[in-house]
Each structure stands twice: as C-alpha cells, then as structure tokens.
Amino acid sequence: MDLTAARKSYREDGVVFVPQALDAKALAEALAAYDWSLANPGPLATKFAQTTDATFYNDLYNPGCIAAYRQMLEASPLPKLITQIWETPDIWFMYEQVFLKEGGESRRTPWHQDSSYLSIAGDDLAVAWITFDPVAKSDSLEFVRASHKGPLYNGSRFELGDDTAPLHPDADMPRLPDIEEMRSKFDIVSFAVEPGDLVLFHPAMLHGGAPTHPGMRRRTLTLRFFGRNSIYDRRPGPAGPRAPGIHGRLKQGDPFRDPSFLKLTP
C-alpha cells in the first residue's frame, strides 16, 4: 500500500480504500467477533425493516464487547495501519457496531455523520468498515468527499419519511441537507468491496448506505478508534461514546481519555 497516498486521501477526502487489508486469519477473527455480537445482542440492539421478509439489524456499545473482541483487536493489523495513516503512535478502541441486512427490500441507511452522535473531535479519529460479503459499488457505503471538514450537521433521527429530521430540534446546528434529492450537487464516492478489503473514514464524514434487495445479504462490522489528539467535544443532548461517568467528568476541550477504552499497541 502507498502510505503517502493513503494519508493524503484520508486527510483531504476523509476516506481511504485499502484492498485486502485483512488476511484470511484476521478476517476470520473479525467474523468471529461479528458472530458473537449477533449471538449476544446488547441493550441497544435494534431491528429495522419495511417489510416482514427483510432484516435490517443493528447493534452497538455492547457491554460485553471488550472481553469478546480484545483478542481480535490486539492481533489485528488495523491498529498499526491506522496509526501509520494518522502518523501518530497512540490508538484506543472506542466501540463496535454491527449491521445485518438481508432478505427482502430494506431501506437505505440515511445520510448522517457519526460525529453528530459522539462527544469527541480531532483529526485522529477513524471508522474501520469491514464487510463479510462482496458488495458492488452501487450497493456500497457512500460518502460526500471532504465533508469531514465541516460543517457538523444536526444528527438524523432516522425517521421514515424524513431522513433529515433533526436529532436536536432546538440546537444551533445546521439541518442535514436532503442529499438523496440533490445527489448531483454533491461529490459522492463509493467503492466495490470484497471480504478482506477495508474502507477507513473519519466519523465526521457524511455517509449513507444503499438498501438491500431480495436475495442480498450484507454483513458489516465497524470498529471505531481514536488517537492522542482527540478532545472532548460536547453535543447538545445525550451522546456517545458510552463510558461510565465520562460526560460528567470531562469538560469541553479536555483530552479524550478514559480507562474503560482499550489502548492498543500498533
């Protein structure tokens, strides 16, 4: 991999595609972690569907995740790769999120920025998007190039019928644009992805996922990480990451640190 090009793409575009970043062993360990999450739903596990024959399952912040994921994370090539792209030696695991879309027609994942839901900011933040099924470019995660540079929009409530309905109606944050209705006005990028490939993006990137169609299955694991320069950045309402007492202890602009987050050795 050309690290110079990857760094430039990540800093300027907010997203980089890394073919075959995970070898067979690392991919199998990631899949085992994903399967553990499906078999052990956490308190935030949710199933969305528009039809009875479609599954759209999502889970995150599972309290058993660290114990179940630790071995996979410590053996994974991802921490080293991400710190090489960041050009910083420190990396912590923030949280996991799993998605399962299969069966009939399921809605697309509305456009949003993860950072709208997270009280953390900084350049050295990353979401590692891993698929366990081949995904065509037309069916893949989509990004608005360079949108991590701002603005930070009000989060979507993911309401049926209005993808831009604001999470914080009274907050002084711009409302999400209706990107699906104005796609030609945005520089949208996506990638055809095979198992073992990695899509790495900054959580402030505007992104959304295509729907699934009958006969399709899309199993996705996302792993979120933060680095040394990350700071606490309060949101207008309740926000992640979830760590006991962190939102009462940290003040605006404090270094983002908490012993509950697993520090990894690149």
Task: Please tell me what each predicted stretch does.
Residues 97, 113, 130-134, 143-145:
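Short, structured patches in soluble enzyme cores that scaffold and shape functional sites
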Residues 89-91, 95-96, 107-109, 124-130, ...:
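Generic beta-strand structural signal
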Residues 137-206:
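Double-stranded beta-helix
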Residues 40-51, 156-158, 195-200, 204-266:
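Non-heme Fe(II)/2-oxoglutarate
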Residues 114-116, 125, 207-212:
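Glycine-rich phosphate/pyrophosphate-binding beta-alpha loops
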Residues 1-13, 18-111, 116-119, 236, ...:
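Non-heme Fe(II)-dependent double-stranded beta-helix
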Residues 119-137, 192-193, 200, 224-227:
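Short, conserved beta-strand element in jelly-roll/cupin
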Residues 78, 103-106, 123, 134-137, ...:
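Short, charged/polar surface micro-motifs in flexible loops or helix N-caps
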